[in-house]
Amino acid sequence: MQLFRDTEDTELFRTPKGDLHVVLVAGSNGWWNYRHQADVAHAYQLMRRNGVPEEKIIVMMFDDVACYPDNPYRGQLFNRPDGKDVYAGLKIDYYGSSVTPENFLNVLQGNAENVTGGNGRVVDSKPDDRIFVYFTDHGGYGLIAFPDDVLTVEDLNTALVDMHRRKRYDRFVFYMEACESGSMFQAVLNKDLKIYAVTAANALESSWGTYCDNDMNLPCLGDLFSVNWMQDTERHGINKETLQKQFKNVKALTNLSHVMHYGDLKLAREPISWFEGGNEKKMIAPMFSNADTYEEQHPKVSWPSRDIELMHLQKLMNTAKNAQVSKTLEQKIARIHEDRRIIEALFNSLVANLLANANDSAIEDLKCHNDVVKAFDSICIDLNKVIVFNYQDMTNINASLINS
């Protein structure tokens, strides 16, 4: 019997039976969201280099950034300044219009008959198997974004509960990079589901993009939490660290938001190799070595996720050498400010007239929250704009309606 000893816990754990299934999702599109697709491409390379078979990894990514007209490195993606191309060799299963909340949930649940587009691959897991999901995109209070839709906390939780009921896994780890990502699990994720979730931020704060002030003429190359957990794995190796140790390391490094964990915290005592790696004998050298030295040479410059497009445009305008280019950038910046003003005025009016005593609180009625989110998304306003430009008013509207 092979055993693993946690460096911070004296308990012994058997190597799990079954297979590891990995699902990697970049929920955004557009040039300014470069970092999400670079994050997922890096995660794919990390899993492959840690021995996870290609057939056990499913990738969902719009795939419009690597060959975007503004990309000076056509056909390549970078997750750190002057790093290696993480796009080469990437296998994408669902791209373009097939990157949807419905497909994501059907892929997770193994519902091959319900997926649309893509190659139709789903997680074909069994009761003894492990599942690792990494999601990166924008988020809001009780929701995460996809290119043309949103996924609510109720829909995600319903799928997870169903997977547990149908014995689709033995252990499940979920890493989520998004603003307010903690709201997808806080007071919702039952520890009896044997799911351990780690989020880039708590329920009420922004996550952060990083490597934003790079000299490669690119938007932010990665997200702070995402870059930190992947570099932590590369720095320490999958067989030398537990999920709990990685959580502590990443929490300390991600100093601009509060990295949180939820669910079955006992799973955190298990080695990251059970969820971020495969066959130890098939492991090859890490993609990025000498991480500590690299950080000294390339310190991270991080920006709030919602302000990345605005701040990048301002940077381009400040360095523009052509008057016409500068004027065009100035007009784009003005449009962003005007969009924000309109949306802020709308939500301020709603709060003032309907919810004068709104208070922030955890989501208690998932169905009510789900109904409010979908009503706004289909009738009132594009929630992807709300996610990017304004979130606190939406938070208050949801929480107040739910708890009134």
Language-model regions: role of each:
Residues 1-404:
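Cysteine endopeptidase catalytic domains of the caspase/legumain-like
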